[in-house]
Every structure is written in structure tokens, then in C-alpha cells.
Amino acid sequence: TISLKLSDLVSSLEVIKLDTASNALITGGKVILSENYLLLGPDWQGIYKLFGRKGNFLCDVGTYGRGPEEYMQIADAQLDEGNNRIYLLPYEARKLLVYNLQGKFVNSVPLAVFLTGCRMKVENDKVSLLTTPLNVPIVAYQQDMKGNLLDSVSARPYAVNRGMMGDINFSFNREFLSFHTGHWEEEETKQDSLYHYIPGKNRLTPKFTVNYEGMKTIPQHIYYEFGDYFRFDIYRVKTVHKETGIYSSRIQEKCILVDKKNRKAGIFKMKDDLLGEISWGNFSDGYYTENLGPAVLKAKLENLNKKEGLSGETRKRMDDLLNTIQENDNNYIVIGKMK
């Protein structure tokens, strides 16, 4: 068994209380960081909001709707503080929407290929995009800001069946984009890999896979990458038949960690010695983040405070924070910088 503590992965932990003004209130959702700003967006539909790094509300980003300068569902977003830009990529992506740090619409960038549910990166006047290889001709491509296609990767070698769903994620430091076919409620499983897409190379580079030789069937699985490790989770799908239909849920059976340096692997347990329960989906782009309502944060801190072995400094920090949390507070943003 391999054990890691959150403090092994992050060098610091910051808890930011958001402004409680009525127009600043948010639910949970995405957290995107820069040196002086927080860009917060809903999990699905809704408006993106810009805050200062101290939690002060600055502005809404654009407006919610179906108009040419508006949006409803956003698949991905990027905060570019140095160039006074915010990029929002709608779920049905025909154009990339560009706003300034005052939340005002600047322009839109036509996309060379119409795709849905993409992830994107804007850098040096170029846009790189990735999507799930499901009924699409291209899985990754790069273009300029005028919509001219610069390179692309065919989806054919990576295609998944309609019953499968893929997943795509950024690397921690946006040095590349990573892609893997994580499966959920699928009709069949298959041998697959975690890939890196390096824009301009016209290909995906495989970085990690698992040999399931000897097993009767390949199990449900998802691959992850963070820091010095690869991680893969094995699941079983539980199907329940009800009068209203057939429902499936995913149950984790094993979590296995692989050290990149020595390739040693073992059953993995994560110990959060800083804040409570870990949410793995929140490791991204060089940070560990949480977007928590006041009641949720208070419960996490109270549970952690009951544990033995906490340093006096850690316990005092938690007590001080607990004493400031009020029921009617806006959300709290937790930020841990990856080592």
C-alpha cells in the first residue's frame, strides 16, 4: 500500500472567503486561477464571475443567453491576466468567446473545426483544442486566431464506441494537453492509454497504459496523471432496474498509484492532513482547488479537528477559520500550490 499526504503534494494551502454581496453569490463549480484573479464558473449552465485573489467581487463575465456575445454552457475557460483576456469555450464550439478583465466582450475567434465538449489552451496567438473521439473526424488540432487550421490529429485510431464516454484533461502546468479514454457506463472496455498532445506535432504521444493480460475481461477504468505519479482506478458498474427505467452507478474497487521514476505500483490511499476529504477532480493546472459552501467547509474542518496527530499550528489555523465561518457566507475557495 502506498500512502501520500496532501502536504506531500502541495507547498501551501490558502482559504479565500468570497465577497458576500448579492451579485457575488455563487454555488460550487470550476476554479481558474492567475496571480491576482479568481475566475469562477458553474458546473454546467450559468454566468462566470471574476474575483480578486482576496475574494473581492469584480464583475460578471459577459451575459447568459443565446445571443452572439452570450453563452449558456461552457466546456472550458482560460484566464490570461498578462494579456487582459478571459477565454470562454462554449460546449457547442463554433467560436471561442473573448472578454477582457472588466467582463466586457472583446471579440470571438472562429474555430476551424466544429466540435463539442472540448478542452482548449490559448498561447502565443494559437488555440489548441481536444475533444472525445466519438463520431468526430479530429480528436486534437491547433489553429491561429483567425480560424486557420495549423495541424490536426485524426480521431480514427482513438475512436470509442457510442456506448463509451471519454474524458480529457490538462496537464498540471499547461505544458501540454493530456488525453485518455476514461470509460463510464460503457458497453465494452478495451486496452487504451493516456496520451499527451503537443501542439504542432500532429500526433498524440502515449505516456501510460496498463497491461490487463490474463484477465478474462478488461475492467472499467480511468487513468490520471499528477506530479510524479500516474494513477488508475478500477470500477465496477452496478445496474439497478426500476419502474422508471434502468440506472447505472460506478463503484470504485481499487485505486492504484504508479511512481513515474521507478515504476513501482501499489494500492493507493490518500491522507488529507490539511483540510479533510480529498476530491481528485480538483488537481489541475498546478493547483489543488476546492469550491466549498460554508456548511461543507465547516463540516470538513470539524471532522479533521477530531483526528489525532495534528500539529498545534495546524489545529490553531483550523480553529481560527472555524470561528469566522457564518451560515450566510458566500463560498470559500481553497487553493493548494503543487510542489
Please state what every model-predicted region is:
Residues 34-43, 84-90, 125-133, 173-188, ...:
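Short beta-strand elements that form the blades of beta-propeller/WD-repeat-like
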Residues 73-74, 89-138, 149-163:
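Asp-box/WD-like beta-propeller blade repeats and closely related beta-sheet repeat scaffolds
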Residues 205-222, 254-286:
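Conserved blade-ending motifs and adjacent loop-strand segments that build the rim/top face
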Residues 27-30, 71-77, 114-122, 160-169, ...:
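Repeated scaffold domains used in trafficking and secretory/extracellular systems
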Residues 19-28, 47, 56-83, 90:
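Blade-loop segments of beta-propeller domains
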Residues 139-146, 190-197, 246-261, 329-337:
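Beta-propeller blade signature
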Residues 285-339:
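Blade-level signature of beta-propeller repeat domains, shared across WD40, Kelch, NHL, RCC1
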Residues 2-27:
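A short helix->beta-strand "capping" segment at the edge of beta-propeller domains
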